């Protein structure tokens, strides 16, 4: 399902309007199937769950259409980002504070293990339609644009629905031995078997229609996709069971304990260490790293990218813990952060801008939603803060900082490339200086 060759086959023979219509419906279906979206919907009591889910899904679908148009017509990514983020911050000015953190969190939450691989593969497949030298570079940036849709959708809902700042703390299950712990996990597996099956069913149905009507893949390719689907199903069930049963209570408890210490400021450095390492556990990060290495022929190594992401996430978690302890409004961080990120787009190679804004959505995946957010919620409850305003926003912060760190990596890469070019030109200039005093027809004795 996530094979870019499949998307390439299904798009190359279709007119543009059909590609865009299918892109919209694919974006909606994939987003509805994203498990983390259900978690987000439960955190916004003033908006009905289905209204929020459908609005966010429509936002992703609409911006997936924008992203596909950008690829097909070779439109630059940076101006689009400046315009759309400008619109976001203008609308945010009129939205109640209780909606702001959740709105910006939604952009990171919806680009998770279901959405990212499919959207990136779709970008690679559609960019193959173009034959120019910039086509591969333009295959990045889909996740970046699709992350904008949910933020706008929730902000617009904030203009319609009244703000309600309620938060219900997660129950921390108790297990006194390994047998009880095993039962606790086993009791939750059936729920996630059903939830993930429901999430994958629309994708399988959509793919089945295309297989019968249009693409008609070979048996070997079909078996490969089915095996991949089985791996995806089993992996997501195990991952989400462990994350929701183990990580959410653990994060909440750890945050409560640390914030209750005589020196609650220990939250900031501990949060930074956790943030540095937790990004390595994000499933979608490895999908992005692999695709970046392949499309850049190893010029951007996975290791350098992972370090940049880890540093960015560490900084964002540290700032989030600072917000929890001090109650600083989230916009005091988001506005300067996005301003710096958008300013860097003027100097950084376009490929790095696209990868950086993609990585923001990728880094803020299920690990962030199931551990870092509960960590902040537990700490905020312990210090007596407003959980809706101060704890929410961790996902948004995690999605923002990689935009800066990866573009700084791109700036370093650009400087090094320029130095290499200058060093390569020096021998030629020296040779020209040696022969500068001779006429064109002069005889040079060796």
What are these regions (language model features)?
Residues 15-87, 264-345:
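Helix-loop-helix junctions within the multi-pass membrane cores of secondary transporters/permeases
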Residues 64, 87-95, 117-125, 333-355, ...:
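Hydrophobic alpha-helical segments of multi-pass membrane transport proteins
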